[in-house]
Curated annotation (Swiss-Prot):
Entry's family note: Belongs to the Fmt family.
Residue positions binding (6S)-5,6,7,8-tetrahydrofolate: 109-112
Organism superkingdom: Bacteria
Organism: Solibacter usitatus (strain Ellin6076)
Name of the protein described by the UniProt record: Methionyl-tRNA formyltransferase
Job of this protein: Attaches a formyl group to the free amino group of methionyl-tRNA(fMet). The formyl group appears to play a dual role in the initiator identity of N-formylmethionyl-tRNA by promoting its recognition by IF2 and preventing the misappropriation of this tRNA by the elongation apparatus.
GO molecular function: methionyl-tRNA formyltransferase activity
Annotated gene: fmt
CDD domains: FMT_core_Met-tRNA-FMT_N, Met_tRNA_FMT_C
Amino acid sequence: MRLVFLGTPAFAVPTLEAVVRAGHEVAAVLTQPDRPRGRGQNPAASPVKQAALALSLEVYQPERVRRPEPVEFLRGIGARAMVIVGYGQIIPQNVIDLAPLGIINVHASLLPKYRGAGPIQWSIVNGETRTGVTTMRIDAGLDTGDMLLKRDTEIGPEENAMELGARLAVLGADLLVKTLAGLEAGTIVPEKQDDSQATLAPLLKKEDGRIDWAQPALAIHNRVRGLQPWPGAQTTFRGQPLHIWKSRPVTAAQAAAPGAVLRTRPLLVASGEGALELLEVQQEGRKRIPAADFANGQRLTENEKLGEGHL
């Protein structure tokens, strides 16, 4: 099938590679323009651009896909379908209408749950134990289009957003190939989403990473897992930011105030319910280290408090 692929992040790369392996003709790959990255702020290609070039595919990087030139570019390709995975721009109706089989999206949730930009992260933060991927035809709404196929999977109790994202990217790639085959054969019956069951997964903000020690330890642990790599789960230590990379909830009977250090070996911090064992932390401007090394190096004492002061 003659296709156009639209995508930008690493999550989209397995789908692009799977589509090519399946024998589809990818006539063009649209991805976001090169953006400044790193300390030197030098323009860097997106993961999808890098993958497309490695596959010898044509790459097109319009600033705005809704402008006349990109629309005419896409019209001239004459693709039967388009595939979109994390492209990063809203697709206007006049572009949606160009592909006879529609624009097919891989979304990292079991729609209609977790519509939006952060389904992987929010599913973990909210303590979900199962999630999955959905292929759908996009429409003018936010992840509201007709569903095509789904595949579910368990979320591991210690799995973080990066690990889950890598797994869902592979699941989504396989599901997308099956979706294209089903559309071509006419065996897929699109299913309307039940808006009454919809939940949202909004774009992450830096303040989402702030730890509220009054929450149960399990909820804080889920935030630590879910918000990696950005914005990350953060608290304060002696008035300075402290990033928590790994943790473990502990059932502990204690009367200490939330945020108080209960023990230093292992490093246990009181929460609204139970305690959180810190396993790996990072002070601002320093490397990630085991929490035991942090406690020793800072001469941490019991009853010191985390979370005091502003991030």
